């Protein structure tokens, strides 16, 4: 199993500072070699079942049972595209009501790992993160698992959960200790075997748009992915699912799984125009996520006994008849950096369009959003693309999708780039990462040789016939400085691809060095 043991060289002199917590957490990351080995094995029910059982065991060693988590009144959301935005919309709506503490657990983070564990919209502070992190760390060091029941967790005092699993367990501990009374959980990968799926009785479950991703864990077809995602359905709990416009064939399987798992109700949610609402997240596709969040929040509020100031729905088709002012305010005030985010960077005059996207479906949505924003502009502008997809085997296919959407076909408007830049996710020109942006799951050799970036540059040359100026940089800081040095007051820059790129870009833009 993917666990980590503390060898003598890895033993960390734990001084109980936030920086020490980050260093300890980073020691739990899977390295590139172990991830590649897992990919070659393909999906494994036995391995996945073992993984989720280990989460149960680790929480047991902390002194918790699955029913303890029911106190959190958990909303559980999965999907391939839009699950994070749906969580953000849901949180923003609920903040308008008299809920004392709302927890939000999401992944990945952009700039700081504390973004993953929020209370009332704010990441927990460094002091609390370190405090709770080491409470969990010490408990795992001083407790034991039955070697017959948990042979993979031996020796108990050395084995810790890997990075994401540890953070998930930590989030449960934080929320319970902090007295959170509503918690929103975004699934990491899939559903059935995800670390978050130890939840016994959520108040409601939701699934956003489905697509092909994480195939080495979930299978390489939409049916197996749907089977896994629907694993968050729970007996007696309502389920809301975005209507799957790209994969309508999944509806029958979703209905079958809902029946198998005994949900109290299942509703497919259509995208709706909300004429009196200006969503806080731009992009036409966010209407779908907002519509799903409206149903999830409405259901949750009723479950916890809040029945005033809720939306009204039509009896015949279930569509929204009237939104309450609180729902409107929540939808308009949502804040979710790095997703369809626009930053006007004075005094340089550069406008940055930022969106993390790593699947064909999300690249399509992201590129469409950027294109629509550019079409609105009155006169032609100079444009640049900043792109990376490290660790994605289909990076060329993703770049080709971006090109096809922005450049268009036939009579479609064409949005072309004057400069195209490919960079690694390395933060600084010194070759260093900010400590909270370190990722061990890519090949160091490939990063040093700029293999992916040079390949992407060649792919683009073939796509546009060598018209754009192409640049390959070893780090994000150098790429950003190049764009700033262009001196074009109307430069429009599309920052797209890996969320690791987006997070590093935001750190560089704000010059937030460790």
UniProtKB/Swiss-Prot annotation:
Biological process GO annotation list? one-carbon metabolic process
Q: Which SUPFAM superfamilies match?
A: MurD-like peptide ligases, catalytic domain, MurD-like peptide ligases, peptide-binding domain
List of residues binding Mg(2+) 2: 214
Its keywords, alphabetically, are:
ATP-binding, Cytoplasm, Ligase, Magnesium, Membrane, Metal-binding, Mitochondrion, Mitochondrion inner membrane, Nucleotide-binding, One-carbon metabolism
Q: What class of enzyme is it?
A: ligase
**Keyword Hydrolase tagged:** no
The cofactor(s) it depends on are: a monovalent cation
Q: Which GO terms describe its molecular function?
A: ATP binding; metal ion binding; tetrahydrofolylpolyglutamate synthase activity
Q: Give its localization.
A: Mitochondrion inner membrane; Mitochondrion matrix; Cytoplasm
Q: What is its main location?
A: mitochondrion
Which cellular components does GO assign to this protein?
cytosol; mitochondrial inner membrane; mitochondrial matrix
Annotated positions binding Mg(2+) 1 = 107, 186
Q: What does this protein do?
A: Catalyzes conversion of folates to polyglutamate derivatives allowing concentration of folate compounds in the cell and the intracellular retention of these cofactors, which are important substrates for most of the folate-dependent enzymes that are involved in one-carbon transfer reactions involved in purine, pyrimidine and amino acid synthesis.
State what protein this is by name: Folylpolyglutamate synthase
Please name the source species.
Candida albicans
